Amino acid sequence: MEEKSIFIEYFGDSPYMKVLNFLIGGQEFDYSMTEIARGAEVGWSAFTRVWAHLLEKDIIKQTRTIGNAKLFKLNKNNPFVKRLIKFDLELTKLETSKLNQKEISA
């Protein structure tokens, strides 16, 4: 069984959360839509519904075009995205701290 990220454990594995989780994890890189859908393990029809919302809310931005492929990444200038990244980091710290406490107690 594949281990879920802390983000997915807290917020569920809906297509929207899976795409956000993938983009947060790879926030320094840009990806094609196909790469994001595959990396997030989301079917294409569900992905396109999520994608429309991410574009509408300015959560993602196009970075460049290679051939016919448009590449995208998280829009880290968006205040919501900034908070989301910070929140993901805080969740990771919290869960790591809990895990360390369990190991010390054992």
For each feature predicted by the language model, list its residue ranges.
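Short, hydrophobic-biased segments on the C-terminal half of alpha helices
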Residues: 51-52
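Amphipathic alpha-helical dimerization/coiled-coil segments
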Residues: 79-106
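A short acidic, leucine-rich amphipathic alpha-helix
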Residues: 35-39
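Glycine-centered, phosphate/nucleic-acid-interacting loop/turn motifs that mediate DNA/RNA or nucleotide
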Residues: 58
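Short helix-capping/hinge SLiMs at alpha-helix to coil transitions
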Residues: 24-29
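Short, cationic-aromatic polyanion-contact patches
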Residues: 7-16, 32, 62-87
